[in-house]
């Protein structure tokens, strides 16, 4: 059965794509649709909210990190059992890593041959919205913009002028609006939305967004604008070794450690490993029969007090590592293996595997893609290999 699919894009970061995406997913789910969510780029946080709203895993589609063949396979293999699919873009529609827009949301929409819903932040503007939408429509004729969602609409008059301006200059329909809200439905932080695992009222926020979409979106027209896509069956996993049938791998997954790609977890399971989810904030100790431990990224700094207070779990972790338990830790997970973390003058003890104290600045220093070439012989990567 074909799955109707669409890309949700914006004119820039902060346009309201995440609000629109979660609102759409939640409303369509309440209406009985099974919707597969996808997030363009390496983002974990938006993907987490989308997964929670849709009630099913959200998969990342990243043109920088993945080949076109991998993107097509990941997308089509994860459509099975769905009625609809929604891909949230990132940044502006044509924004990429260079002046030609390489790896942009537009490129992804072209690759997948999907229409685009354009979310526009209309704060303090009216007719200029039509000029921006018209520019996006004609900038690349391969990009099929199917309609517009107007965000930050202040009054009925504000909405009317923008609708009339769009009708006079384009044939693109307005498929929904998001009124200007007095308070953020999502709690915000330095990288955008706060992870849903850290927000006690996440389900209420999603419920509010579902109500908003039902009141202000033309859900019937949105689903009609989607492009049917035929799912494909994923290939049967080829197990590396019969030994993996007996492997049990612990995964720290809680409010502190949440940054995992579903594909990576599924790859481990596909090789026969059993994954055991562990809450480092509340568990007394690691399970006794683990063969390995995976600690992903996240924000251990926001849970520093809880991590520090869980003395028994930290002692258990150190004991297992001293007894040669293999551990893969990255980003926030690697920080957790340090001696301590310094936050605003207060030092919080961590696992203490490495004699290192981490400190965090108030503002992010930088983030983005990096590319490396392996220059020396080592255990993990072939010399000359390109790493992203």
What are these regions (language model features)?
Residues 300-380:
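Cysteine-nucleophile active-site neighborhood
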Residues 245-310, 315-320:
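Phosphate-binding active sites in nucleotide-utilizing proteins
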Residues 2-112, 120-147, 156-160:
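ATP-dependent carboxylate-amine ligase catalytic core
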